[in-house]
Design a protein with these regions (language model features):
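Nucleotide-activated chemistry modules centered on ATP-dependent adenylation/adenylyltransferase
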Residues: 1-102
Length: 102
């Protein structure tokens, strides 16, 4: 199995995060390998806030997760990914434990 983190908020931004992409990849994966694999996107129909809620309920240590696209030692807090992450935590009335620049 191959798992990836596409979520509902990404459908319109990234073609590889759309349900049609997942279906097509699974069709290709079934015929292209000696041992067929499946491509899984368990959060495809969940918002980022819903994903954060699931993680909080499971006790995930979000200080050990990364969202920023800038590739620095600390998250920038300004890119689209950081903004979505901060909003997801805010919608869950929880402070994001990640340290941000500035």
């Amino acid at each position: 199995q191959v798992w990836y983190g596409a979520h509902a908020g990404d459908h319109f931004i990234y073609p590889d995060c759309r349900p049609e992409f997942l279906s097509a990849m699974n069709a290709v994966a079934q015929i292209c390998h000696t041992f067929p694999i499946s491509v899984e996107a368990p959060f495809l129909n969940y918002s980022k806030a819903e994903i954060v809620k699931i993680g909080l309920d499971l006790g995930i240590d979000y200080s050990k997760t990364w969202t920023c696209y800038e590739g620095q030692d600390q998250a920038c807090g300004k890119c689209g990914s950081c903004n979505e992450r901060l909003e997801a935590f805010a919608l869950n009335n929880t402070a994001d434990p990640l340290t941000y620049q500035g």
